[in-house]
Amino acid sequence: MALPLRPLTRGLASAAKGGHGGAGARTWRLLTFVLALPSVALCTFNSYLHSGHRPRPEFRPYQHLRIRTKPYPWGDGNHTLFHNSHVNPLPTGYEHP
């Protein structure tokens, strides 16, 4: 015999009809100001402390990297579209700044 669904739906409808949030909204506001914002500030401060300039690694001309079978259609044909001369080496090595 099938159970009637009416008592189940009424229970859910009456629970949704009550106060909206109340203590739950206060709890999340408290968690935001006590946990989330200080955590973001701490992570920001940590990344600021570790943001020093690091020397770039020694260039090693691996055969499987930086393969140019035909030149790029922009610039001199050897630089990629978003080439950064500070971190991206060319097939012959790093560019001198």
Curated annotation (Swiss-Prot):
Localization annotation: Mitochondrion inner membrane
Subcellular location, principal: mitochondrion
Segments traversing the membrane: 25-49
Tissue and organ expression note: Expressed specifically in heart and muscle. Not detected in brain, colon, spleen, kidney, liver, lung and pancreas.
Mitochondrial intermembrane-side segments: 50-97
GO cellular component labels: mitochondrial inner membrane; mitochondrion; respiratory chain complex IV
SUPFAM superfamilies for this protein: Mitochondrial cytochrome c oxidase subunit VIa
Biological or metabolic pathway of the protein: Energy metabolism; oxidative phosphorylation
Membrane topology: Single-pass membrane protein
Pfam families recorded: COX6A (PF02046)
Family annotation (InterPro entries): Cyt_c_oxidase_su6a, Cyt_c_oxidase_su6a_CS, Cyt_c_oxidase_su6a_sf
Organelle transit peptide: 1-12
Keywords: Disease variant, Membrane, Mitochondrion, Mitochondrion inner membrane, Oxidoreductase, Primary mitochondrial disease, Transit peptide, Transmembrane, Transmembrane helix
Mitochondrial matrix side: 13-24
GO biological process, one term: mitochondrial electron transport, cytochrome c to oxygen
GO molecular function: enzyme regulator activity; oxidoreductase activity
Family from the record: Belongs to the cytochrome c oxidase subunit 6A family.
Disease: Mitochondrial complex IV deficiency, nuclear type 18: An autosomal recessive, muscle-specific, mitochondrial disorder with onset in infancy. MC4DN18 is characterized by hypotonia, limb and facial muscle weakness, and high arched palate. Some patients have respiratory insufficiency at birth and cardiomyopathy. Patient skeletal muscle shows decreased levels and activity of mitochondrial respiratory complex IV.
Function field: Component of the cytochrome c oxidase, the last enzyme in the mitochondrial electron transport chain which drives oxidative phosphorylation. The respiratory chain contains 3 multisubunit complexes succinate dehydrogenase (complex II, CII), ubiquinol-cytochrome c oxidoreductase (cytochrome b-c1 complex, complex III, CIII) and cytochrome c oxidase (complex IV, CIV), that cooperate to transfer electrons derived from NADH and succinate to molecular oxygen, creating an electrochemical gradient over the inner membrane that drives transmembrane transport and the ATP synthase.
Summary of subunit composition and partner proteins: Component of the cytochrome c oxidase (complex IV, CIV), a multisubunit enzyme composed of 14 subunits. The complex is composed of a catalytic core of 3 subunits MT-CO1, MT-CO2 and MT-CO3, encoded in the mitochondrial DNA, and 11 supernumerary subunits COX4I1 (or COX4I2), COX5A, COX5B, COX6A1 (or COX6A2), COX6B1 (or COX6B2), COX6C, COX7A2 (or COX7A1), COX7B, COX7C, COX8A and NDUFA4, which are encoded in the nuclear genome.
Protein name as it appears in the record: Cytochrome c oxidase subunit 6A2, mitochondrial
UniProt source species: Homo sapiens (Human)
Name of the coding gene: COX6A2
